Structure formats: structure tokens, C-alpha cells
């Protein structure tokens, strides 16, 4: 038996090509860099020509693969090494964002270059946002002038919706915050952003990505107070941003207060202790009685699981509110607070459809408990109500209001007879 393996025939003169999809192209940005730098050197400071060059080059150069290189060159003139310094290679251009004039008009023109480029090549959007995040982390490696230009550009890009406000997360980097770089950068950024839009637009963008309550993080922990934030940005000419942050902190404090109140009620703490706690919080946070009664009402109504059946929920509400009427009474010492409470009740009964028929019974209960006065109820009925469910609630209150008016007239006539 021949144990030797039989040799298989071979094909000669045949070359097998690797399929294109199996080829692994080497990452080498140097040729790409040379092409971009050469083009920018030719276009110079003419940003219209720069935009046209970038538009045309996208058809010949691999923007998708070398997006970071492209953006590094447009911003800093060459490829950036970690930390924000330019790489040692000599392929760089003097025509970039960092060498441009430090004024808003020039930065607006640069923003247009980026805007046109990203609109033309939509796939660059994500890479551009990542580039901005990276540049913000490199701020310490840039000069003050370079930071100012980048801040102005970023503000304009945020205003135009080219990038998301989530990029601000990079500014909360501990080292940048500790050295005051983040706060100084934020001043320039928000000035250019508000210059393009307004504080309401800025606020909406911040809320969208959950940044509205994080602005205090631009400062180190020992300076992270509303007072410090307010003074810093007001002195820098950004009072509207200071007011916004103060308002956000106030909203945050109210939410925390409401949460704590609900927990105290769930734990079954005494009304005396709850009232003392609320009064202490009013002193600490300077919350007015009108604002506080709204918080108390919401907490009272959120501290219980309501029956889904309309016919049972009214009875449940009356029982619950009877228990907490002393708490409501403690924070309705003024007519304006009473009216605020009455409007809150109207809105609540309208927004929660099972309570639509309970409105009148709730008002009567609180009248009997000396929480709501007849003057305030009559004022609400004639002119003080809001539009929500107006016709339904006015109809419900009609007989009780007539009774109040008659009682008032009888009382007046008795006084006259007594005189």
C-alpha cells in the first residue's frame, strides 16, 4: 500500500486577487492632509472660496475616513496631538480659524463654512460634533485668543442648531473647571449664542439635553453657588443667563421641597411638624406664600393613590382634603394665596377628568374649613377664574355663589338693623 499522499495538481500562471471588500486600507492621513492644506493655502482668507473648495474636494477626497483630520486643519491649521498642540509634521496652513480675526463677524463667516460643508456632506455631522467635544477638552493647550474664537464659533453653531448643547459636557472636565478655563470660555460662548438667538432659545436647547440644571458645574465645588454664578456672569454682561440659572435653581428647590413634603405625608408625620418644616423652607428659600400654597396643594394631591371611578373619587378627595385642610389653611393667610389655591384646584380638576364633578364639593369643604373666604370665591366666580373648564365649574358653583350672596345681603341688613 502506498502511504505517500497523492500530490494535488496545481494551476500555474494564475494570480488570485483579494476581493475589494477584504482589502484593509491603511489609515494614512498625510496625503489627505497635504491636499487640504494646499487647497486652503490657495484660497487664503477668502471664505467663500474655502467653502467652494471644500464642497468640490468631497468628491475626490475621503472625508468620511479623515473627518477628524479635516476639522483639525480647518480649526488649528494642522493635525492636533493629544492635549491640543499641533503635530510635529510641517504640513500645516496659516489659513484657519485660530489665525483669523478675533471678532464676531469673522466667526459668523467661519460658522457658515462649517454649515455649508455639513449640509453638503451630511455624514460629517456626527464627526463634527465629536471634534467640538474634543476641542473643548483641549482648551488648556490653546492660547486665550484661540479659546475666544472657538467659544464664539461654538456659540454661533449652537444657535444655528449645527451641534447639540450636549457638547457642553466637555466643559465640566475637572481640570478645566479648577483652573477657571470653563467659566471664562462659557462667557464668550453664551454671549455669541444669545447674540444670535435669545435666552429663551438658549434655555430650550439646554433643557432638551438636560444641561439646564448643570451650569453651576462650570465652577469648582467650593464656588458652586447661585450667588457666585450670578455675580460672575452678571459682571461679565450676561445677566439674562444669571437670571435663568437662578430660576432653574428655584425650580429645582421647589421640586425637592414637593418631593420631601410627599414623603413626610406618606410617613404619616403630624401636620404640626409638616407646617413647621414648610415655614422653615419658606424662610430659607424666600419662597412667597402664593408659590408655597401651590407646592403644598400639589404635594397633598400627589400623596395618595386616587380611585379611577368618578363616583368614588369625590368621596375619597373630600376625606383626604378634610384631613389636610389645616395644612392648606396655614399657607392661605392672604387673599392672593387663597385665589392661587382656588385656581390650582380649578386646573387640577380640569386636568384630571375624574375630578371634574368634584370641584364644587372641594371648594365648599375648604370654605367650611376656613381655608377659602367668601370674598375670594366670589372674586373667582366673577372675574378671577381661568379658561380651563370655565363653563362646567361656573355652572357647578352657581347655587353656592347665590347662597353666599344672599347670606352676605342678610348679614348686611342685620348690621343695618342693629345700627
Curated annotation (Swiss-Prot):
Q: Which UniProt keywords apply?
A: Activator, Transcription, Transcription regulation, Translation regulation
- UniProt cross-references to Pfam families, sorted A to Z: HEAT_5MP1_2, W2
Name one cellular component (GO) term. cytoplasm
Please note every region of biased composition (Polar residues): 1-15
- What SUPFAM superfamilies has UniProt attached to this entry? ARM repeat
- The question of whether Repeat is a record keyword is answered with no
What is one GO biological process annotated to this record?
regulation of translational initiation
Q: Does the keyword Transcription regulation apply?
A: yes
Q: Where is the W2 domain?
A: 247-414
Superkingdom, taxonomy of origin: Eukaryota
Region: Disordered, residue numbers: 1-29
Q: What is the stated purpose of this protein? A: Translation initiation regulator which may repress repeat-associated non-AUG (RAN) initiated translation probably by acting as a competitive inhibitor of eukaryotic translation initiation factor 5 (EIF5) function. Enhances histone H4 gene transcription but does not seem to bind DNA directly.
Concerning its family, UniProt says: Belongs to the BZW family.
Q: What is the designated name of this protein?
A: eIF5-mimic protein 2-A
* Gene field: bzw1a
Amino acid at each position: 500500500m502506498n502511504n505517500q499522499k497523492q500530490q494535488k495538481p496545481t494551476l500555474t500562471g494564475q494570480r488570485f486577487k483579494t476581493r475589494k471588500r477584504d482589502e484593509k486600507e491603511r489609515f494614512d492621513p498625510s496625503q489627505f492632509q497635504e491636499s487640504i492644506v494646499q487647497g486652503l493655502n490657495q484660497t487664503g482668507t477668502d471664505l467663500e472660496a474655502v467653502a467652494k473648495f471644500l464642497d468640490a474636494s468631497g468628491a475626490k477626497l475621503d472625508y468620511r475616513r479623515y473627518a477628524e483630520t479635516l476639522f483639525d486643519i480647518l480649526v488649528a491649521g494642522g493635525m492636533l496631538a493629544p492635549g491640543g498642540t499641533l503635530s510635529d509634521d510641517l504640513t500645516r496652513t496659516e489659513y484657519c480659524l485660530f489665525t483669523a480675526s478675533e471678532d464676531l463677524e469673522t466667526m459668523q463667516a467661519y460658522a457658515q463654512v462649517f454649515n455649508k460643508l455639513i449640509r453638503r456632506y451630511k455624514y460629517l455631522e456626527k464627526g463634527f460634533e465629536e471634534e467640538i467635544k474634543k476641542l473643548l477638552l483641549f482648551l488648556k493647550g490653546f492660547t486665550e485668543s484661540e479659546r475666544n474664537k472657538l467659544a464664539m464659533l461654538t456659540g454661533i453653531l449652537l444657535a444655528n442648531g449645527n451641534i447639540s448643547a450636549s457638547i457642553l459636557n466637555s466643559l465640566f472636565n475637572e481640570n478645566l473647571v479648577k483652573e477657571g478655563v470653563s467659566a471664562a470660555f462659557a462667557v464668550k460662548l453664551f454671549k455669541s449664542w444669545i447674540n444670535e438667538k435669545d435666552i429663551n432659545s438658549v434655555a430650550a436647547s439646554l433643557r432638551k439635553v438636560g444641561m439646564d440644571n448643570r451650569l453651576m458645574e462650570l465652577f469648582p465645588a467650593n464656588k458652586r453657588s447661585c450667588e457666585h454664578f450670578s455675580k460672575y456672569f452678571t459682571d461679565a454682561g450676561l445677566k439674562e443667563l444669571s437670571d435663568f440659572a437662578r430660576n432653574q435653581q428655584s425650580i429645582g428647590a421647589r421640586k425637592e421641597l414637593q418631593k420631601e413634603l410627599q414623603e413626610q405625608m406618606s410617613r404619616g408625620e403630624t401636620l404640626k411638624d409638616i407646617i413647621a418644616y414648610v415655614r422653615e423652607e419658606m424662610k430659607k428659600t424666600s419662597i412667597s406664600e402664593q408659590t408655597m400654597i401651590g407646592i403644598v396643594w400639589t404635594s397633598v394631591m400627589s400623596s395618595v393613590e386616587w380611585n379611577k371611578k368618578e363616583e368614588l373619587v369625590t368621596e375619597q378627595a373630600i376625606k383626604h382634603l378634610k384631613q389636610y385642610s389645616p395644612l392648606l389653611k396655614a399657607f392661605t393667610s392672604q387673599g392672593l394665596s387663597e385665589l392661587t389655591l382656588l385656581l390650582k384646584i380649578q386646573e387640577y380638576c380640569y386636568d384630571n377628568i375624574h375630578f371634574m364633578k368634584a370641584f364644587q364639593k372641594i371648594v365648599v369643604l375648604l370654605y367650611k374649613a376656613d381655608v377659602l373666604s367668601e370674598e375670594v370665591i366670589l372674586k373667582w366666580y366673577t372675574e378671577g377664574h381661568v379658561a380651563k373648564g370655565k363653563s362646567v365649574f361656573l355652572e357647578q358653583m352657581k347655587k353656592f355663589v347665590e347662597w353666599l350672596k344672599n347670606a352676605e345681603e342678610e348679614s348686611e341688613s342685620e348690621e343695618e338693623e342693629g345700627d
